[in-house]
Amino acid sequence: MYATTVKNKITQRDNYKEIMSVIVVVLLLTLTLIAIFSAIDQLGISEMGRIARDLTHFIINSLQD
């Protein structure tokens, strides 16, 4: 009986940690996207094209490694 109670509490704690980790990741991604779109909003169209090109080259080079 006691072992089952302890096991359930450990499982609940693990679930809580997992849920909190997901929430933190979602918040960080949201803040990152807000920062990116804010930066894009402050740049002109030509700057966005240059950044998109550089980002594409960076992603392609990262995948080739």
Swiss-Prot record:
Keyword Cell inner membrane: yes
Source organism of the structure: Shigella sonnei (strain Ss046)
Listed Pfam families: SafA (PF17073)
Lineage: Bacteria, Pseudomonadati, Pseudomonadota, Gammaproteobacteria, Enterobacterales
Family: Belongs to the SafA family.
Major subcellular site: membrane
Regions of this protein lying in the Periplasmic compartment: 40-65
Name recorded for this polypeptide: Two-component-system connector protein SafA
Record's function text: Connects the signal transduction between the two-component systems EvgS/EvgA and PhoQ/PhoP, by directly interacting with PhoQ and thus activating the PhoQ/PhoP system, in response to acid stress conditions.
